[in-house]
Regions:
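Short, surface-exposed connector motifs at secondary-structure boundaries
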Residues: 164-169, 225-233
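Glycine-rich phosphate-binding "P-loop"
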Residues: 142-147, 197-217
Length: 378
């Protein structure tokens, strides 16, 4: 398994110059040696990136809730939230030894930027400032996971709010639980949105099943819903759980994955976990687009933030991501972010207003992937 960051595509758009600089980056890394604060002593920078961005995340132990003999969703949400709060208190946000730090983890991206800048200066080349279509300074993806059929009705409320700012979004449906009538999908696509596959059953077990049974279930779903095959180009796993086996299979059906956070605190793995970068990266041909803003559920129900603090946390992270020329990925859930829950609703409305004026390219995952790979391929 090998990764390739989109950062190089943004700052060195000529493929020949990029290849030369990438080789120089490797030589500089050899001279510098191990970077303090990074949890890897890889021999090459490419190995370091792959180790931190993928290997550490997929090596996380299987959470207890996914080992239960029954579906963890039978446990009432307040009880689940209380358990996460307890775990959260055992792993304080400010723990300096944590990797990745939360809500921002700059160390890998800082090292990458430093190496590329030094390599360019030594070669007498000027790196480009990361920009996106129309000179935008970064990109934003608005995504929504639909975790039950009851949540389908909440999509319209969110889209009314997003259309107020002329913003597209992407919506993930669970094949066994929240797969909608075709009319819902057609309406979203006509509205400029994208749909993606959100797990298969969202029971926490998919990544830990044997690969033949995973492959068979995906094949059965697409055989039964052939019309969705060209529309479903991406995937996000339930609870953001991932294993090397599942990640290696996804490219058989999908062109991008949204499962890995750059940093998440209080999630299914107990403490901090994530891929530690705000730049999308290829994993053996599959584009991984990290989830880079904290999810609504955790801010509201685990961190217990009020609306103002939710919004300030989102705004601060949005600015940090865009300042790097990265991709800010937002994930909200209609079950939590809806007009009946004013804390989350007001925070999301404020975030959308900020996004609309942030000088960012607000797009969908497939459009982002197409544009980024166009840069990569020259």
């Amino acid at each position: 398994m090998r990764t390739e960051s989109s950062y190089g595509w943004l700052v060195a758009r000529d493929p020949a110059a990029r290849a030369r600089l990438a080789a120089d980056v490797e030589r500089l890394y050899q001279v510098r040696g191990h970077e303090p604060g990074l949890p890897s002593e890889a021999d090459t920078f490419a190995e370091l990136e792959t180790d931190i961005q993928v290997h550490r995340y997929v090596a996380n132990p299987q959470p207890l809730f996914s080992r239960l003999p029954f579906d963890y969703r039978f446990v009432p949400p307040p009880v689940r939230a209380a358990g996460l709060v307890l775990i959260d208190r055992l792993h304080p946000v400010g723990a300096t030894e944590a990797f990745p730090r939360w809500p921002q983890e700059p160390r890998l991206d800082d090292l990458r930027t430093s190496l590329w800048s030094e390599a360019a200066a030594a070669a007498g080349l000027m790196l480009e400032t990361p920009t996106y279509p129309d000179g935008r300074r970064g990109a934003v993806l608005l995504t929504h996971d639909i975790d039950s059929r009851a949540d389908i009705g909440g999509i319209s409320d969110i889209r009314v709010l997003e259309r107020r700012f002329d913003l597209p979004s992407s919506v993930g449906f669970i094949p066994r639980i929240s797969w909608p009538d075709r009319g819902v999908i057609d309406e979203l696509v006509a509205d400029g949105c994208e749909i993606y596959c959100h797990d298969l059953g969202h029971d926490g077990k998919l990544p830990y099943r044997d690969l033949p049974s995973i492959r068979a279930d995906f094949d059965r779903f697409f055989e039964a819903n052939a019309y969705a095959r060209p529309l479903l180009r991406g995937f996000r796993s339930g609870q953001l759980l991932m294993t090397a086996g599942l990640l290696g299979l996804l490219a058989e059906w999908f062109s991008f994955d949204l499962s890995l956070p750059d940093t998440e605190h209080g999630g299914p793995y107990g403490s901090n976990a994530g891929c530690a970068t705000v730049h999308p990266f290829l994993v053996d041909g599959l584009l991984e687009i990290p989830l880079t803003l904290p999810q609504d559920f955790f801010l509201a129900n685990v961190e217990k933030y009020d609306s103002a603090r939710m919004l300030s946390t989102w705004r601060d992270k949005l600015e940090a991501v865009l300042a790097r020329g990265g991709v800010a990925v937002v994930n909200t859930h209609p079950v939590w972010t809806n007009p009946r829950r004013q804390r989350e609703w007001a925070a999301y409305a404020g975030l959308l207003e900020t996004v609309a004026g942030a000088g960012a390219w607000v797009t969908t995952p497939s459009q982002l992937r197409g544009w980024l790979l166009g840069l990569r391929n020259g």
